[in-house]
Amino acid sequence: MAAGLPQIFHKRGTLAAAREPDIVNPMHESSSSQFYIVIGKKQDDKGLERGRKNLQKLFGDSLTMTKEMEETYRTIGGTPHLDGAYTVFGEVTEGMDVVEKIQNVKRDEYDRPVEDVRIIKATILKDMPGYEKKQVKRTVKKPVRRKR
């Protein structure tokens, strides 16, 4: 997957494709099987500036942070420093309390949950604008853990 579309950014609750580090993945290709859900935090001027600088580094003047993005990051939160570097493909529309519980599960030395956390059901709400291929919003439902 190609990284970064300006219409969709790393606000709280977005789903994005993970990827290997730049040193082993210089083309920044996204994983087809791993993703993350943005928790992030409400951003101040310093956090927004970090996001702006990253966009400038990646895209020059061809892609900038909009006023809508800034306001969303200030009021809802997110991770603006990831914009343009990872592919955002969906959004949690309900169940962020469950996502926060997942964030707090016990993890091993590789930052992986000690017990698997599985999303059993995701609901397609609508196609997301701006994508050539069909991309969808997803609703995260109650996670189920199983012993390894």
Question: Where are the predicted features?
Answer:
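Cross-family detector of peptidyl-prolyl cis-trans isomerase
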Residues: 1-148
